[in-house]
């Protein structure tokens, strides 16, 4: 019994890491593996949907309230976005990884940090969370075209695309550093990511709306039927996050050889 329990714990651990394999060919173990894997994946999807819901509800809600009542101010909007992301990272990060962003999920999978087979499920959960949050805001407030809380390019599409790529690059560069590097202090990941989003909204908010997240733009667009420049907020964040992760991994990949060279130099001097 102890051995069986140990095998089950090992299987659960593998499932949580996205490596779902059956350690036994027996029908009982296969059934256990299947049932637990479904539960684990459902937990992750629910966490992503809830996390994305509150990110969009608070962030877009601050935009709507400011446009309707004028009481939040632009700095308040920036801080709200950063705070809600930070809070939700610490709340469900240990369950789902706290992506809340299809571009981040796709990038993690391309760089081997997330299983491909879960990507469509994560994206669906994120979009559902965004759509539900946008629908909630539309029911709570009289959202006129002037009070639209989605993202629409203020200038040209090219300008908004460029700035979305840049700020998404910065966001993923920071995420790669604080959430995937073993040398980083994991406890500060939420703070670092939240502050990065706050800074990005300060810089890019007046130009593109500082989406950095296809789900953040798609949800309000579907609910309010505003599709102007929507492609910018799908293409830009994906390109930016891929580039940010690539550059960070390029820098990190040179770290080990440099340390080995330093050790060799030290041994020669001694």
From Swiss-Prot:
It comes from the Eukaryota. It is found in: Membrane. CDD domains: MIP. This is Probable aquaporin NIP-type. It comes from Nicotiana alata. Belongs to the MIP/aquaporin (TC 1.A.8) family. NIP (TC 1.A.8.12) subfamily. The keyword Repeat applies. Keywords: Membrane, Repeat, Transmembrane, Transmembrane helix, Transport. GO terms for molecular function: channel activity. Aquaporins facilitate the transport of water and small neutral solutes across cell membranes. A motif (NPA 2) lies at residues 213-215.
